[in-house]
């Protein structure tokens, strides 16, 4: 195991002569991942694994995690508030808010299933479909809707996972 850990530390560019207390936050996270991977796990459980990292270090850590999951026998269960990391790493996304599971679905299916509708507040009020979240401003309105519920020809925009989460929460999901 120690040989594998040393090999991973070299691969991750971690200095072997530096003490842990002198490592940056990103280096500490890489070391934690190296130690975890040294045990040849099939499943990694990660809580806010990229929290507090600068964008470059966050990208390096998510790349390491992606390499791990390229083996179909490996999985990661990750909790994070950094939605871009979830979009990069996850095949399936579960969204919890105030202890309630709002959704749990494959990431690509979520993008295909939901869309953003844009129009005026009056058009939104007249919309005859279930709205999963909405935002009304002096400049217009947007609504999170299911693509298949909208009339043919309705102009819809793709929704990011972050927009989906924000509209479900701020837009009073399932009012």
Give, region by region, the residue ranges found by the protein language model.
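Conserved protein kinase catalytic domain
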Residues: 2, 9, 62, 111, ...
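ABC transporter nucleotide-binding domains
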Residues: 3-84, 88-97
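A generic structural signal for secondary-structure junctions
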Residues: 13, 115, 122, 169-170
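Non-catalytic surface loops within mature trypsin-like serine protease
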Residues: 31, 121, 147-149
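Short, surface-exposed beta-strand/loop "edge" segments at domain boundaries and coil↔beta transitions
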Residues: 44-45, 123-127, 149-153
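ABC transporter nucleotide-binding domain
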Residues: 62-145
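C-terminal coupling/interaction segments
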Residues: 132-175
């Amino acid at each position: 195991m120690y040989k594998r850990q040393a090999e991973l530390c070299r691969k991750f560019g971690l200095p072997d002569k530096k003490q842990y207390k002198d490592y940056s936050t990103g280096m500490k996270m890489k070391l934690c991942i190296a130690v975890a991977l040294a045990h040849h796990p099939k499943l990694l459980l990660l809580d806010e694994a990229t929290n507090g990292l600068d964008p470059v270090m966050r990208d390096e850590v998510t790349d390491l995690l992606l390499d791990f999951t390229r083996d179909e026998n490996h999985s990661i269960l990750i909790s994070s508030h950094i939605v871009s990391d979830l979009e990069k790493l996850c095949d399936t996304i579960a969204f919890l808010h105030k202890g309630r599971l709002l959704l749990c679905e494959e990431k690509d299916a979520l993008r295909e299933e939901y869309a953003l509708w844009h129009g005026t507040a009056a058009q939104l009020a007249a919309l005859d479909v279930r709205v999963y979240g909405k935002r009304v401003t002096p400049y217009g309105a947007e609504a999170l809707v299911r693509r298949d519920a909208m009339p043919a020809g309705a102009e819809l925009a793709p929704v990011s996972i972050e927009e989906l989460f924000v509209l479900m929460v701020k837009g009073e999901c399932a009012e």
